Amino acid sequence: KTPDGNAFLRQIKGMAPGDELLVQVTGYGEDGKAIPVQHRVLFKSRFVIVTPNAPGINVSRSIRDDDRREELLAVVHDTVENVPHGIILRSSCEVAEDADIADDLLSMLSLADQVLSDDGSGPEMLTEGDSPHLLAWRDWVEPAEVVTEDGGFETHGVMDAVEALESPR
């Protein structure tokens, strides 16, 4: 049970009904259905993902420049002496300023510590989920192509895409 209703948790092996557990909402419950949750809590931001109970520092595989990978690992070690949780450095770190990555890392580690240290009991929301705007800013890091010339819809196939949406699949 959550403050917003019943939840559905996969992988419940070893749990008994009524056991309390820290979970993270992973989606929206359809009308009449339970809210999907997982017990593996992640703290995502633009540059890092903090993974409690999954130690290690990992750099996104899409960052192929070995020098940049080493620089990113140095940012983590220079920012945090003893890393208490696992950390994934996201692909957006490749072109980001090191200071921005360090600030983001400290913010996410602080949030993780705050949530994980809560010793309350009963259903409780420990933090707000990200807004759609923040989700977009976090996950869409490539610069947008803005077309303002006449004929832009035709040049980029917008009308064809709209027509495709009108037909049944």
Name the predicted role of every residue range.
Residues 1-169:
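DE-rich acidic low-complexity regions and acidic surface loops
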